[in-house]
Structure formats: structure tokens, C-alpha cells
């Protein structure tokens, strides 16, 4: 155990107040020669750490699982999940929660080591992770944070000095993940499947205290909990859709109760606008396609509601009715969030009857002409209509006149409208081919400069800076079709 705490560790372990069926205490498995390859300075500071101390050998040993900081209580969390519609009892198969860091402002964040070795939930896996997927999670999660989308974050990546065997031999790595918590829809499914109402109540009470303390005194706090999670997910999924983010594996174990995006395995950002876009190699039926994400979120939340039925009301029929009523509200909340976001993307302050039609017409044209999602809105924001099939079409020219006329009707000036668009239309996203370039350089050549440059650009997606323009360039035909694999 590390005694020197100049690094700023301030760990608590409230999760162990839950019944022991929710976790297994287990130490991380040491690795041979850990090396720090990436540290998130700004995140470290916000968590109360001293970044310079975290670069020292004793702290790198903690990120590698070779040592534990003061106050650590390593454990693997148990949960269940519907994976592509099929229910399984799961758990942290290659991750350990080492504790909850209490920040200088009193906030609580899980500190989890991902790739830290086998656990009782590993299901024949080796408990390890490869460098490429861990760096990928770092890049995408930090890009999501900069886009103002609730997300888990990445504090550090260390290489282990040991190979990891997948289809081929790959360099091993461990990611330090930071989250408001790792409580998932699947955690509630796990509690419900075990059949103990006391355990289910314990989990619900703990979750309310940790994430939604304002509803503790609510006359039916478990209904209120369901309402809060639905509200958070309706907002989150709308934010995904508005930037063209495709999660790829929206299983119930990847839906957080806090409303943060988690698990960046087969995710990617859409290039051409297409409702049917799928990147994940294992999603052969398009279950988690871009256009399906709102529906799948509702499906996942229905599984949460099912799990809560034993504590929603003492009468089962009444509990079922409460669950159904609350789930039915998701689609309206999602639509409202999405519509408000789309209005901002088009600079619309006021509300007009034609707004829905204006938005739908644009999206239909974008799909028809295979227009790039991000760059179309970027061009509209800059009012630079480029030489593309969409912009040269008669339909678009007609639409553009209607849109300009709509902007002129507003009390707010066009300058204000374009300024709002700038704040809601990212100039750059983590383009799939640029992420792969960065990973190739880092993993194959040990050159992290490409990744650092990409991260620097992605940190300010709404800056519209000229030095970001290289990241707006579309992939060449050889970079398509892009496929992702569940490596994280």
C-alpha cells in the first residue's frame, strides 16, 4: 500500500455499504513493467490530484494495479444485462473499483482500473485490455466531454509491458476511468433477478442518496428515481443524436443511472447522414443503428422499470401501471430535447409552426444526397455553401430561401442566430479515420504526437479555429466502410 499521499488521494468506499452480493472484494493483478503513456492533467486537478506527483513511479504503480493508494478498497461490481436482447448475469470481468475520490468541492467520483486482471465475473476472459482500445476510449470520452455530453472520463493510460492475446498479440494497457458512479440499469436487473426486495431497496436507496438526494423525501421516491433516470437518458440520447454519435452497444449494462455515456467499445461518429448507420461489427441486424438509439434507450429503460416493480407499489398491478406510465413519457421528453437542440443548430430562437417541417426537410435532403452530417451544419453556420451534391440541388436552394426567411422573421439578429449555431454545431468531431491514424501511430510506432495533436483540437470543438480545419476533411473512399470492434 502506498503511504505517501502527496498525490492527493482522498478515497471513500460507500459502495461497500450495499449488501455484499453486489460486489466481490479482490485485488488487482500486478503487471511486469508499467509505463505511463497518457495523463489527463485538467481532470487530475479537478479531482484534487497533483499531476506532477501522479507521474512518479509510486503513482504509476497504482494506475497499473501494482500498488494501492491509502483508503483503497478494490472490488469488482456485480450486475446483469440484456446484451443484444439476451439476458445474462454479468459483472466487472476486467475492471476494479479501487474507491471513490472525494474532490476538494466535495463531489464523489468512482476511480476504476480497466484491464486490471481477472475477477470472478471474467467468464473465461483474461481480465486484460489492449492499448489501442484504451487509448480510443480516452480520445472519444474526452471529445464527448468537450462536446458537453455527459460521460465517464479517462484519467490515465499505462502500458503493462505484457502482451494481450486477442485475434493477434497486442500490447497490454490499463485505463483509469472516472465516473459519477458505475451503477447501471443492469445493476438493478441483477438485484431484481436475485429476488431479494430488501437488496433491491438498498440499491435504490443508495442510488437516490448518491445521485438524486433531492428526491429522498418524495412520497414515492422509487417512482421519482425512475422519473429522474428517464429524464437524464432522454437528454443524453438527444445529445448523442444531435452530434451524430453512435454508441454501438446499448445493452442494459451500458446504460448508467447517472445519465453518463459509458463504454466506448464499438462507438463512432457518423460521416454521411444516414438513419441506418451502424459501425459495430457485431451489430449485424442494426439493432443499435443511429436512428434506433432513442427506441433502444426506451427499451432499456423499460427493463429498469420492470426491475423496480416490486418496490414501486405494494399492489403489483398498480406498480405495473406506474412503470408503464413513466416509460411512456420518455419519447415526448426525448423529442422535446432533440427538437430544441435542432432549432439551436439552425439558429432558431422563437417557435413557428413550420420549424418541424424545416428540420425534417433538411435531414431528408442530407440523407438523399449522402451529405456529411457535421460539415453540413458547419457550412450553414459559416454561411459558406460549398460545392456538394446537396448544396447544388434545387431542393436545397429552395429550402435555403425558406430558412433565411425564417431567420429574418425573428426578433434576434442573424448575427445572434449564427452565434448560437456556432455554439451548437461542432466544427470538428473525432472523425473515425483520424482516430485510427492516431492509434496506429501510438500503438505501432510508439508515436503519441498524432494523438496529442488530435486531442488538442478536439478539446475546443466549437472554436471554429483555422488550425482545426485539417480535422474537418472527410475520409477518402478507402477509409470506408468503417467498422468498429468491441475492444474496450
UniProtKB/Swiss-Prot annotation:
The active site is at 253 (proton acceptor). It holds the Pfam family SelO. GO terms for molecular function: AMPylase activity; ATP binding; magnesium ion binding. InterPro entries: SelO. ATP binds at residues 91, 93-94, 114, 126-127, 177, 184, 263. It catalyses: L-seryl-[protein] + ATP = 3-O-(5'-adenylyl)-L-seryl-[protein] + diphosphate; L-threonyl-[protein] + ATP = 3-O-(5'-adenylyl)-L-threonyl-[protein] + diphosphate; L-tyrosyl-[protein] + ATP = O-(5'-adenylyl)-L-tyrosyl-[protein] + diphosphate; L-histidyl-[protein] + UTP = N(tele)-(5'-uridylyl)-L-histidyl-[protein] + diphosphate. Its cofactor is Mg(2+); Mn(2+). It comes from the Bacteria. It is an enzyme of class 2 (transferase). Keywords: ATP-binding, Magnesium, Manganese, Metal-binding, Nucleotide-binding, Nucleotidyltransferase, Transferase. Mg(2+) binds at residues 254, 263. Its EC number is 2.7.7.-, 2.7.7.108. HAMAP family: YdiU_SelO. Nucleotidyltransferase involved in the post-translational modification of proteins. It can catalyze the addition of adenosine monophosphate (AMP) or uridine monophosphate (UMP) to a protein, resulting in modifications known as AMPylation and UMPylation. Belongs to the SELO family. This is Protein nucleotidyltransferase YdiU. It comes from Bacillus thuringiensis subsp. konkukian (strain 97-27).
